[in-house]
Swiss-Prot record:
It comes from Homo sapiens (Human). Residues 389-502 form the PAZ domain. Keywords: Biological rhythms, Cytoplasm, Developmental protein, Differentiation, Endonuclease, Hydrolase, Meiosis, Metal-binding, Methylation, Nuclease, Oogenesis, RNA-binding, RNA-mediated gene silencing, Spermatogenesis, Translation regulation. This is Piwi-like protein 2. Its cofactor is Mg(2+). One of its GO terms (molecular function) is piRNA binding. Endoribonuclease that plays a central role during spermatogenesis by repressing transposable elements and preventing their mobilization, which is essential for the germline integrity. Plays an essential role in meiotic differentiation of spermatocytes, germ cell differentiation and in self-renewal of spermatogonial stem cells. Acts via the piRNA metabolic process, which mediates the repression of transposable elements during meiosis by forming complexes composed of piRNAs and Piwi proteins and govern the methylation and subsequent repression of transposons. Its EC number is 3.1.26.-. Interacts with DDX4, MAEL, EIF3A, EIF4E, EIF4G, PRMT5 and WDR77. Associates with EIF4E- and EIF4G-containing m7G cap-binding complexes. Interacts (when methylated on arginine residues) with TDRD1 and TDRKH/TDRD2. Interacts with TDRD12. Component of the PET complex, at least composed of EXD1, PIWIL2, TDRD12 and piRNAs. Interacts with MOV10L1. Interacts with GPAT2. Interacts with TEX19. Interacts with GSK3B. Interacts (via PIWI domain) with BMAL1 and CLOCK. Interacts with TEX15. Its main location: cytoplasm. Residues 28-65, 162-199 are annotated as: Disordered. The active site is at residues 745, 783, 815, 948. CDD domains: PAZ_piwi_like (cd02845), Piwi_piwi-like_Euk (cd04658). Residues 34-48 have a biased composition (Low complexity).
Amino acid sequence: MDPFRPSFRGQSPIHPSQCQAVRMPGCWPQASKPLDPALGRGAPAGRGHVFGKPEEPSTQRGPAQRESVGLVSMFRGLGIETVSKTPLKREMLPSGRGILGRGLSANLVRKDREELSPTFWDPKVLAAGDSKMAETSVGWSRTLGRGSSDASLLPLGRAAGGISREVDKPPCTFSTPSRGPPQLSSPPALPQSPLHSPDRPLVLTVEHKEKELIVKQGSKGTPQSLGLNLVKIQCHNEAVYQYHVTFSPNVECKSMRFGMLKDHQAVTGNVTAFDGSILYLPVKLQQVLELKSQRKTDSAEISIKIQMTKILEPCSDLCIPFYNVVFRRVMKLLDMKLVGRNFYDPTSAMVLQQHRLQIWPGYAASIRRTDGGLFLLADVSHKVIRNDCVLDVMHAIYQQNKEHFQDECTKLLVGNIVITRYNNRTYRIDDVDWNKTPKDSFTMSDGKEITFLEYYSKNYGITVKEEDQPLLIHRPSERQDNHGMLLKGEILLLPELSFMTGIPEKMKKDFRAMKDLAQQINLSPKQHHSALECLLQRIAKNEAATNELMRWGLRLQKDVHKIEGRVLPMERINLKNTSFITSQELNWVKEVTRDPSILTIPMHFWALFYPKRAMDQARELVNMLEKIAGPIGMRMSPPAWVELKDDRIETYVRTIQSTLGAEGKIQMVVCIIMGPRDDLYGAIKKLCCVQSPVPSQVVNVRTIGQPTRLRSVAQKILLQINCKLGGELWGVDIPLKQLMVIGMDVYHDPSRGMRSVVGFVASINLTLTKWYSRVVFQMPHQEIVDSLKLCLVGSLKKFYEVNHCLPEKIVVYRDGVSDGQLKTVANYEIPQLQKCFEAFENYQPKMVVFVVQKKISTNLYLAAPQNFVTPTPGTVVDHTITSCEWVDFYLLAHHVRQGCGIPTHYVCVLNTANLSPDHMQRLTFKLCHMYWNWPGTIRVPAPCKYAHKLAFLSGHILHHEPAIQLCENLFFL
């Protein structure tokens, strides 16, 4: 064998599980995870996606599973597949995220309920998208018109359910809720009507919702004209009509139902949305219509009764799902390729030859209903694809480490996302099968044996060059086919035909390479707007695409929508002896390094640990710290110099332990390490945060090795040290008295079975400059109400110790909740938190709870005279694009230096303090000034960011709860 080519044969170091069935990457159309619409998140990129590919049956199938009828199956028309990873039974519990991690989704249906009717879910529960209750993403891995040449018939399916940015991996098991009172993360059963029967006549209803008046607009600030990446949609149809279809005698097979209904397109028209029982049409038929069809299997005559049951407004929530399916078809007509859940144009790929990368431009698009009506949300998306196939990566690994080649390959490849360009699908690599090669064969659905070499040659015209390469394994979740059969098995991929996606780790550390990439991906507002204009022009010039929209009476505006927003007043920053109004750039680094902080802690007893070869950098750092300590009002003594003979982990840990044992008054441990060492950093933090609690600061020698930057770096280090010792840097004016602000965020630890780590940070003084922090570890499905009680009660007790009173108002900022979980948070999880107040006699504070959503697609442009530019920091929008269900607003608090202005979405789910919209917006903006790791505004309120840093440190580095001795200091900065 060629010595420069890896020996692919042999036993895998991580032996793959032996499955009975094997699937080819082009065999079965890969549907995405069945998403609970309440989940509001997109699926991971690592699964097969298909766009119009024919189905190839599996080598093995399980028993047929009974499917439910409803919105979940509405893509299944005329042989269109809408399979899912689990049997479509009502009692199966989709995974979701509660306020504190992994719980049950809001789309929970209990077993003690009567069987549900085949109709849409409550529109209030059809929550989707990044911020709107009626949004459904159209870039999803469902097929359009597969198996049917008639593109006018519009089946609907799970893709109609809402998605947002990303889906968390569901836990490995599901639990059925008890009949007892609801607990944390356990939402109510959905209201559904009983299944229709011939003895129960259908009643025609006309949908007309009176919009409840919700005061959500503020008035403070300067008006400003803004552009949005939303396009107004005009509905020309008067209504959408819902019909109930009954087959007599009953026809169990859905595909037969679709076929029989298709035979009567002369009556129903060629624009339909049918799920096997419920039919939606843009035209009005008779109240009751009787049709006849002949079953082809036995020539039996079947009577089809179509009865009108509901007249919907064209902007109804129930219409949003199949409007999105319509727009997916429009994108297909523009020759856009569906990859993952977005559409891309490979023909316009930008090639970075020096970095061996391709960038595919594309769009993420979804239709949603907001306070301003029906909109198309379109965002520019880019797919980064490497020119290196997996086989090239394997060869490179072989050259570097021949002895442990298979180990290194498995370690590097497993978990990565690859794309197969012959069908534009993405897969996650779950394992490597070192015992199979393309010369091996598999069984087709018709029973024929075929080798992988023959399969690719016959189906794609591809000649495989490397015949001895191993095969990559992708294990999709179990799902059903079109006939309810359970699909199992593995998808085997050829490394030669699989291309790596994403940015290589080595490239992420290359400043020049990342700069080149950012120039292509980070578009200015003008470029972003031009890309959206291009999409609208392509749709307008494509007659087929325009006609597809007009079939349902939809027409797009010619340009993005423009509204009026406001710029909130600039805030006053308070230091110890001075205060000042921030500039438009919202940066006050000069002031905080020139004037004393509010509270500084003298640093008299501290130790500096450094390897011998970093002695010069250590002395320069200490000299600079002594120079800059005076201006910020901090007193410091020389450190205890501890020189290390080497930079091994054991040396650092053993030396720090012995020093802490000998010197009992050490306030701060400062360690200088040689380069970015994650293992060493983690060992130091575990020692100083868990085993021997003491504030610690780890400094990379590279950051202090440049004399020109040493002063600015030392200033940041000293400010961080002051925070970790309990100091207070700056504050803002807080008009609300006796206020406690809480930040909560969740980190999911993939290395520990996706257990949730909750970061909890609360203010414990009246000026919001002193913080109390706790961490809660939660396993999947584990109740943590008791743990939360410890956090909240502990923070209230600490507040009382500091102020000699309890807070009158508590404002909670909760990060990481999707739209689909908002009702669960409001109805179940907040009451659980309020029960904590019972620990104090006669104590019922006013409470305000905000859900903070960062992963949104909404972009803001400032409408300048010539073109769009980046909006001013402090820009707020509280109308038109806001939710129909909640009091919410969008706030761009930070200064955007590159790219577009992506605001943060704030949804108020509780307001017993009766704060006005102006108070909510101003308080939120003030808190965005309070993150002491950056002398400027950040994208989210400071307690949210603190909670995120705490949860990440505890879940990713420590894997353990920090010592209680550190809970009153910001040790996690």
